[in-house]
C-alpha cells in the first residue's frame, strides 16, 4: 500500500447528559476494555470546571491509564511519535463527540511530562526533545486543531480557556471568514517558530504554501471578523432548563451543549453518517 498510518488514536471518554445528569462514558477499546460509565456529574457546568476536576480520583485514573498506554506503545510496540494532535473539547469530524475535558488536560500533561519516552525517538527528534529553553515545548509538541471549535463557537475564545493549558501549535479557520473566502491560520509558540529559523539552509525552513497563502481578501475579511468578535457578546449558550428537560426525552440517547453547539443523540441501532434516525424522527 502507498500509505501506512503511523499515528495512534486513543478512544476518548465522552460526555452525555441524560435525565439531568452528565455521564462520562467510554467505548469498548484497548484502553478501557468494555464500554462503561466512568462517572456522573451534576451539571454541564461542573464538567468544565477544570480546577475542581483536576483534584478528582478520575484525574488520577486518567493519568495512570495514559502513562501505562504510552509506555506500551513506545517501549513494547515500538511506536515513535512526532506530536500530539487533538480537537479540544468537541471532536467535530468524529461525530460531534464532546470529549471529557479532564481527559484531554491529563493527556496533554502526561505527554509533556514523559520526555523519557519521547527522547527515545530517532534523530532529529531525539535531540529536539531535550536541551531547550525553559519556556520551550516538552515531550512532544501539542497541536490544538480548533478549525471548527475556535473563536467563541463554544462560548469562549479558545479551548485553552477551559483546559487551562495552551498548545504549542494552534490551527484556526472556519469562523475567520465564515466560509466566504478561503482562510486559515497556524499559530506557533516561540520555541516552535525558532526551530525553523536557526539554520541558514533552505531545506530547514518551513517550505509550505498553497494557492491562497496570504490571500489579501481573506486576510481583510479575517480582520473585520476579529473586530466584530471584539464588539459582540463573548458568550452565548442554550437554555440550561431546556437542555435538562430534553435530556429526559425517550427518543434521545443523550444531549450535550457548549456555547452555540448543540448535539442531540438519537436512539438508533445504527450510527454515524449512514444512520436514518433523524429522518425517522422528523416523519413521526
Which positions does each model-derived feature cover?
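Conserved N-terminal phosphate-binding loop of PLP-dependent enzymes in the Aspartate aminotransferase
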Residues: 1-284
Amino acid at each position: 500500500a502507498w500509505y501506512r498510518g503511523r499515528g495512534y488514536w486513543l478512544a476518548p471518554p465522552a460526555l452525555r447528559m441524560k435525565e439531568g445528569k452528565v455521564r462520562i462514558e467510554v467505548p469498548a477499546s484497548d484502553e478501557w476494555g468494555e464500554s462503561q460509565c466512568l462517572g456522573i456529574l451534576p451539571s454541564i457546568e461542573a464538567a468544565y470546571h477544570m480546577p475542581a476536576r483536576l483534584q478528582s480520583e478520575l484525574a488520577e485514573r486518567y493519568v495512570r491509564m495514559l502513562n501505562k498506554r504510552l509506555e506500551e506503545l513506545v517501549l513494547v510496540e515500538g511506536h515513535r511519535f512526532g506530536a500530539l494532535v487533538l480537537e479540544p473539547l468537541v471532536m467535530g469530524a468524529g461525530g460531534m463527540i464532546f470529549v471529557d475535558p479532564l481527559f484531554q488536560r491529563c493527556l496533554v500533561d502526561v505527554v509533556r511530562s514523559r520526555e523519557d519516552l519521547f527522547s527515545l525517538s530517532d534523530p532529529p527528534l531525539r535531540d529536539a526533545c531535550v536541551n531547550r529553553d525553559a519556556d520551550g515545548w516538552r515531550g512532544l509538541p501539542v497541536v490544538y486543531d480548533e478549525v471548527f471549535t475556535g473563536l467563541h463557537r463554544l462560548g469562549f475564545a479558545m479551548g485553552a480557556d477551559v483546559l487551562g493549558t495552551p498548545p504549542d501549535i494552534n490551527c484556526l479557520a472556519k469562523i475567520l471568514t465564515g466560509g466566504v473566502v478561503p482562510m486559515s491560520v497556524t499559530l506557533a509558540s516561540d520555541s516552535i517558530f525558532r526551530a525553523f529559523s536557526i539554520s541558514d539552509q533552505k531545506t530547514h525552513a518551513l517550505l509550505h504554501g498553497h494557492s491562497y497563502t496570504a490571500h489579501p481578501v481573506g486576510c481583510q475579511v479575517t480582520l473585520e471578523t476579529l473586530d466584530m468578535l471584539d464588539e459582540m457578546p463573548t458568550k452565548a449558550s442554550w437554555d440550561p432548563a431546556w437542555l435538562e428537560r430534553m435530556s429526559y426525552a425517550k427518543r434521545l440517547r443523550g444531549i450535550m451543549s457548549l456555547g452555540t453547539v448543540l448535539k442531540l443523540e438519537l436512539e438508533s441501532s445504527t450510527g454515524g453518517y449512514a444512520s436514518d434516525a433523524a429522518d425517522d424522527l422528523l416523519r413521526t
